[in-house]
């Protein structure tokens, strides 16, 4: 399957970095340098305490996402983040199933599924994170592991809602370690993920499904990653904290898009 019709996505996960002033400074610097959303889709996932001010100051080509949401819209759940309230702030995207949530907070595939269903119910676009550990990789169980994660996370998700979902493949062994899957290896794994979703739904609906790669993405390897046929974008961690690096990622996506247009004699 080719991805020529799918706009590339550059997503930055700020994790628990930046205070209000630092976040505003970043947004003000990048707002008018981010490429048109028709060329590349650009998202920043920030701490919940920053979401309101970032949404109020985001430029026309930048979207703000949350890093987590609860599996109920409201109620007596002290400290949790309501998906309903995220929408009221103007947030469009939410990260779900990130490996740090799974490892540090014990989130299971079943819990990720509940969060995914509630996010969709509240008209949020979830970015579903999947990824295997080093042990799983070394035991040659990556395909089976990811298929299980995927099947459980997408349980009871109707086909018509699949278009709202993005998937991010983030091998746990590559997150924040400086290690990364080779572009070809990442491409092959993402192809397998796409094939599994095809089996769960249909080939037609999967044509528009965007699957990102994350795991020690940097300015040095982003072009090689984005060039891969099955990879629709990147989810970047700490490397997205600097304005120069973040804009470099977006420009790499635009450059690739322009090259594809020229190669196939299409208008960009």
UniProtKB/Swiss-Prot annotation:
Gene Ontology process terms (BP): gluconeogenesis; glyceraldehyde-3-phosphate biosynthetic process; glycerol catabolic process; glycolytic process
Enzyme Commission number: 5.3.1.1
Active-site residues annotated for this sequence: 98 (electrophile), 170 (proton acceptor)
One Pfam family matching this protein: TIM
Catalyzed chemical reaction(s): D-glyceraldehyde 3-phosphate = dihydroxyacetone phosphate
Major localisation: cytoplasm
Amino-acid positions noted as binding substrate in the UniProt annotation, renumbered to this chain: 13-15, 176, 216
Cellular component, GO annotation: cytosol
Keywords attached to this entry: Cytoplasm, Gluconeogenesis, Glycolysis, Isomerase
Locations listed in the record: Cytoplasm
Pathway where it operates: Carbohydrate biosynthesis; gluconeogenesis; Carbohydrate degradation; glycolysis; D-glyceraldehyde 3-phosphate from glycerone phosphate: step 1/1
Assembly information from the UniProt record: Homodimer.
Function as written in the Swiss-Prot or TrEMBL entry: Involved in the gluconeogenesis. Catalyzes stereospecifically the conversion of dihydroxyacetone phosphate (DHAP) to D-glyceraldehyde-3-phosphate (G3P).
UniProt similarity note: Belongs to the triosephosphate isomerase family.
Name of the protein in question: Triosephosphate isomerase
Species of provenance: Phytoplasma australiense
